[in-house]
Regions:
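Beta-rich carbohydrate-recognition and catalytic domains
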Residues: 1-23, 27-89, 97-118
Length: 118
């Protein structure tokens, strides 16, 4: 197998107009469904004051973007954002698995600051 890097790299860049993905976008997981490719990816926000950490932090959300060709992604949306105590400091590094017609997403959730394994 030969893998060739796209001449259009990077295929996804931060979008300053979306504060939730304005700092960085990376670690994507592509999914093919219904003749489209969806990229589920980690999105890093601009630094902002986080009251629970008592400091400025960049928080990760998970975004999703569809594509017809796997290179040009449009209509990007926030897919998963921290809303539970166990993910209050970020949702990161998504992985998606399709099993018997259902899609399951796994991701890292950050519940503490400074970050540590629990």
């Amino acid at each position: 197998m030969l893998i060739k890097r796209s001449d259009l790299n990077p295929i996804l860049k931060p979008k300053r107009i979306h504060s939730w993905e304005a700092e960085a976008v990376f670690n994507g997981c592509p999914i093919r469904k219904d003749n489209k490719i969806y990229l589920v990816y980690r999105a890093l926000s601009l630094p902002h004051y986080h009251t629970l950490a008592n400091t400025n932090l960049m928080v990760s959300d998970i975004g999703i973007a569809p594509s017809k060709d796997g290179i040009e992604f449009h209509d990007r949306k926030r897919f998963i954002a921290p809303e539970h105590p166990w993910e209050r400091f970020g949702c990161e590094d998504p992985r998606v698995t399709e099993l018997e017609g259902k899609y399951y997403i796994f991701y890292t959730a950050l519940s503490a600051y400074p970050f540590r394994a629990e």
